Amino acid sequence: MKNFALSCIKFYQNYISKILPKSCRYYPTCSEYAVWEFKNNDIFSALLATLARILRCNQLFKGGIDYPVIRKRFGSFSIFKRMEFSNIDFWFVPCKNSKFYVIKVLDSLKEKR
């Protein structure tokens, strides 16, 4: 279901958004916000957060920087356990109790392998 939602958003970004004027009042844009939510949250929470964001994106709200906030629990860390590293796509910046801001790593900063 997540993949279907992500493919719908990508279709919107690639085909529909290109012909419409830029009107989003926030950074990241509402469609990019939705992609980040669906990649890092469960489908129900992502859908609610995306809907709330789209409803806030109008002239009655100031706009500005509005990163997604998700709940995330990280596994335990041990210096004796071997860790596998892959490319980092998102940074999780602490916000409140087990809540984190989601910030995407710029493509130019990603390590080329």
Curated annotation (Swiss-Prot):
Keywords: Cell inner membrane, Cell membrane, Membrane. It is a peripheral membrane protein. The keyword S-adenosyl-L-methionine does not apply. GO terms for cellular component: plasma membrane. Pfam families: YidD. Coiled coil: none annotated. It is found in: Cell inner membrane. Signal peptide: none annotated. Belongs to the UPF0161 family. Could be involved in insertion of integral membrane proteins into the membrane. This is Putative membrane protein insertion efficiency factor.
